[in-house]
Amino acid sequence: MGDVDRDGRAERFWLLGSAEDDYRGPVRLDNGPSVPGNPLANALVRLPLADGHRGRIGDVNGDGYGDLVTGIAEDPSMAGSPDAAHLGGEIQVLYGGPDGITADQRPTVIHQDSPGVPGAAERGDLFGASLSLGDADGDGIADVLVGVPGEAIGKLEWAGAAVLLRGAEGGLSGAGSVAYNRSTAGIPGAAEKDDAFGSTVHLADLTKDARAEALVGVPAENSDGCVWAARGAASGPVTAGSVNHCGKSFGITGRGDHPKAHFGDALPGVHRAV
């Protein structure tokens, strides 16, 4: 939820997941009850040019209006359908304004073939599998942290990565973006096959210094899973001094009642209602 038209009330968007006639995921704007006194009779507006399986709202161009950012990670190689994301996955941006977000609005699409975005679009990268919005550099404009858990690091398949896209007055783009993985200098540990770094991501100002810290889930790390945490700074998340918080430290492992659940599996950024 977020205020995309600055009327003082938050709008809700529903991301309905893959459908038979729309694998990329239909998006609906929920304007609230259309029948007074009946909270179930909501007026849903279809946004036919928008897609997404997960999303977040934040002001990524600094104009005071909330913007909707969605992710579609599954490309045709994974979906088995040509009606899927750009090779390797993509995110979309719908900018808010005085009229909010409207049905005739065409989103801005960003992927790993976009100018300035680190890496290259490859089958199964899952760019956009998770995403989070927050001001990572303290400039007053929201940035977007994008999970890329299927990214290969060298020959290490599914080692995973995360990409920070910087918000700016001109809108979100690849300019100044930064990629992180477990081979990046300053990040503890080492990239390993099937770690799935970036399966979950979150930006939050944990230190109350107006710069969001970055949290990245690595749920397949060893038997328990980890979350990597880096403090925010004017340059964005700082890898020097960053730490891993792993399940074993909290008495959590991938064994027991839920052997397929791991620490780092759950962070905000994967919900279908925004």
Put a short name on every predicted segment.
Residues 1-60, 66, 71, 78, ...:
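Solenoidal tandem-repeat scaffolds enriched in leucines and small polar residues
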Residues 17-22, 74-82, 150-155, 220-223:
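Short glycine/acidic-enriched loop and turn motifs that connect beta-strands
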Residues 6-15, 62-71, 138-148, 208-217:
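Acidic/hydrophobic-patterned starts of short beta strands in beta-sheet-rich repeat architectures
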Residues 24-50, 95-126, 166-196, 229-274:
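Blade-edge motifs of beta-propeller repeat domains
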Residues 23-26, 85-90, 104, 156-161, ...:
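A detector of repeated loop/turn-to-beta-strand junctions in beta-rich toroidal repeat architectures
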